[in-house]
């Protein structure tokens, strides 16, 4: 993946230049809306949960992202977070997501979003990075915003079943070296703004389908092969700051995930359920 990482770095370095060139005052008439917009965020969270599973070993997460959008609907973005424990793909202590897509306004209240997320793990092993196309349909009605989405990662080595269980991974003995597998994730989100308050109630549910073993780096996108994740929470916004508190859980029990240990555990020492229910708090600053 070294070649692809170099391509990603070059693309990211050109984003600010492209944005500056396209949004300069010389190309926009006074009073008109810029054709290119740049937005970003920085956040601190008590844990980084990806589809209900901790990627920071149930410890603090520091995250940030930037998006460059064009009024045609095209956009590119970059998002990153620290990692620990199970989340460290091939020894990487950082996740870097390169995102590109297109948003189409279907009506005043409906938007279709089609794109691709490229999950990068700088400093990790060779077989870590993988690509995942997605599609999202979002609609609004009154104070409610509803989203339905699907993300499908085609067969790739980084998400293949190289180990049948955690014991094989701990011993470093591949059961299926070079294996490629795919992964499907379907989800739904709901957000309801509470009238007269800065609070928005939020709910999420998703289901993952993938291989039931461990990949080349003793991790997996869909631990146990298939599971549900869900969350209930609320946002409170003040100016450009958003405080969120959510309860997050999955239906992966400690007993069910036992065969994936020690990889699938806190500290990767065989103890603790990193997919169990937890209260997560985060503070995000938008700019």
Where are the predicted features?
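Outer-membrane beta-barrel biogenesis signature
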Residues: 19-40, 49-55
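Residues on the lipid-exposed face of transmembrane beta-strands in outer-membrane beta-barrel proteins
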Residues: 42-46, 64-70, 98-102, 116, ...
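Transmembrane beta-strands of outer-membrane beta-barrel pores
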Residues: 44-50, 80-84, 104, 118-122, ...
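Outer-membrane beta-barrel translocator domains and adjoining extracellular loop/strand segments
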Residues: 50-57, 86-94, 123-131, 158-167, ...
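Repeated loop/turn-to-beta-strand initiation elements of outer-membrane beta-barrel proteins
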Residues: 72-78, 108-114, 143-148, 196-201, ...
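Surface-exposed loop and membrane-interface regions of Gram-negative outer-membrane beta-barrel proteins
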Residues: 74-129
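Detector for outer-membrane/organellar transmembrane beta-barrel domains
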Residues: 130-222, 247
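Outer-membrane beta-barrel "beta-signal"
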Residues: 236-239, 271-287
């Amino acid at each position: 993946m070294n070649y692809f990482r170099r391509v990603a770095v070059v693309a990211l370095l050109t984003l600010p230049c492209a944005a500056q060139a396209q949004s300069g005052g010389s190309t926009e008439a006074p009073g008109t809306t810029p054709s290119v917009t740049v937005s970003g965020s920085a956040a601190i969270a008590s844990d980084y949960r990806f589809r209900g599973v901790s990627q920071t070993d149930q410890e603090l997460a520091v995250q940030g992202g930037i998006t460059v959008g064009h009024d045609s609907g095209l956009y590119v973005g970059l998002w990153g977070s620290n990692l620990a424990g199970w989340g460290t793909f091939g020894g990487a202590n950082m996740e870097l997501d390169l995102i590109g897509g297109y948003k189409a306004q279907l009506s005043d209240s409906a938007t279709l979003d089609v794109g691709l997320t490229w999950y990068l793990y700088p400093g990790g092993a060779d077989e870590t990075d993988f690509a995942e196309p997605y599609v999202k349909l979002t609609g609004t009605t009154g104070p409610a915003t509803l989203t339905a989405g699907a993300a499908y990662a085609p067969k790739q080595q980084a998400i293949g079943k190289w180990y049948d269980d955690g014991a094989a991974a701990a011993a470093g003995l591949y059961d299926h070296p070079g294996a490629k597998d795919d992964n499907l994730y379907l989800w739904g989100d709901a957000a309801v703004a509470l009238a007269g308050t800065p609070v928005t109630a939020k709910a999420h549910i998703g289901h993952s389908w993938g291989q039931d073993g461990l990949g080349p780096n003793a991790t997996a996108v869909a631990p146990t092969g298939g599971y549900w994740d869900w969350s209930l929470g609320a946002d409170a916004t003040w100016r450009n700051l958003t405080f969120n508190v959510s309860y997050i859980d999955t239906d992966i029990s400690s007993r069910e995930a036992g065969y994936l240990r020690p990889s699938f555990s806190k500290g990767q020492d065989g103890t603790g359920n990193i997919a169990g229910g937890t209260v997560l708090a985060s503070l995000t600053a938008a700019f």
